[in-house]
């Protein structure tokens, strides 16, 4: 992304992306090559390294007061839980930590991360994402999350994770403002946009 013009909007760029990003290890079928549950053959860090910049992260927060460690990456529901390359459960923390590591090493790049609950607690997912954003915002200038209110330019998005979400935040259960966070930092709510069109 280093060669992209700084003043272009991130939304004007066609980014390579992956569907059901965490499913490299999900093989519930007899023959892996014909698996209907595994949408990827590369693990998350491999996808980053080959140029993928837009990710579909499907989550299962198993409790309402979840942290990123408590949120499993899944395909559909917990039956198809994703694993890392070592066979360990793949968590939102793994994805976010790898994203920060990558952006620290490649500050001209940007990551667009669509987060969706496929199973479990939506409140828990919002809290987990919120705790990550809060930790990043506390870093000041080295924050790796886009915290603007509009779609960022390429320059503004460099070195940042730009969240998009497909879930509502029920502020009666978890209010980002209680943590001094702006709900916009969780990303545009595509789930709400889709519902308005129906």
Where do the model's predicted regions map?
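Long, acidic (Asp/Glu-rich), low-complexity accessory segments flanking structured domains
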Residues: 1-54, 63-105, 110, 165, ...
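Active-site groove signature of glycoside hydrolases
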Residues: 61, 106-121
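Well-ordered, non-membrane alpha-helical segments in soluble/globular domains
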Residues: 89-99, 124-135
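Short, surface-exposed beta-edge/turn micro-motifs
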Residues: 110, 158-161
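Acidic, His- and aromatic-enriched active-site or binding-groove loops in soluble protein domains
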Residues: 132-149, 154
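A substrate-binding/cap region within the structured catalytic cores of diverse enzymes
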Residues: 148-151, 155-158, 165-168
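C-terminal active-site rim and adjoining tail of enzyme catalytic domains
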Residues: 164-198
């Amino acid at each position: 992304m280093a060669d992209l013009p700084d003043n272009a909007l991130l939304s004007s760029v066609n980014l390579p992306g992956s569907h059901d990003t965490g499913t490299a290890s999900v093989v519930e079928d007899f023959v892996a090559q014909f698996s209907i549950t595994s949408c990827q053959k590369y693990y998350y860090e491999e996808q980053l390294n080959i140029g993928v910049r837009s990710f579909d992260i499907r989550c299962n927060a198993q409790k309402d007061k979840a942290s990123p460690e408590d949120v499993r990456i899944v395909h559909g529901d917990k039956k198809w839980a994703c694993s890392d390359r070592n066979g360990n459960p793949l968590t939102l923390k793994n994805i976010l930590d790898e994203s920060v590591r990558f952006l620290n090493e490649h500050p001209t790049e940007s990551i667009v991360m669509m987060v969706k609950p496929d199973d479990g607690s939506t409140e828990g997912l919002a809290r987990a994402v919120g705790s990550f954003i809060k930790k990043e915002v506390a870093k000041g200038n080295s924050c790796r999350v886009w915290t603007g209110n509009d779609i960022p330019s390429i320059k503004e998005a460099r070195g940042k994770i730009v969240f998009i979400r497909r879930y509502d935040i029920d502020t009666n259960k978890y209010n980002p403002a209680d943590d001094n966070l702006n709900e916009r930092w969780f990303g545009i709510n595509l789930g709400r946009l889709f519902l308005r069109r129906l």
